[in-house]
Amino acid sequence: QKKDKKDRFPNGLV
């Protein structure tokens, strides 16, 4: 799930 990363880091820290 690529959305998992955006969901956890909506700020784009990762």
Swiss-Prot record:
Where is it predominantly found? Answer: secreted
Q: Does the keyword Secreted apply?
A: yes
Q: Which residues carry this modification: Pyrrolidone carboxylic acid?
A: 1
Protein origin, superkingdom: Eukaryota
Q: Which GO terms describe its cellular component?
A: extracellular region
Positions carrying Valine amide are 14
Give the subcellular location. Answer: Secreted
Acetylation among the record's keywords?
Answer: no
The entry's note on the tissues where this protein occurs is: Expressed by the venom gland.
Q: Which UniProt keywords apply?
A: Amidation, Pyrrolidone carboxylic acid, Secreted
State the family named in the UniProt similarity comment for this chain: Belongs to the tachykinin family.
Protein name, entry field: Tachykinin-like peptide-XV
Q: Which organism is it from?
A: Phoneutria nigriventer
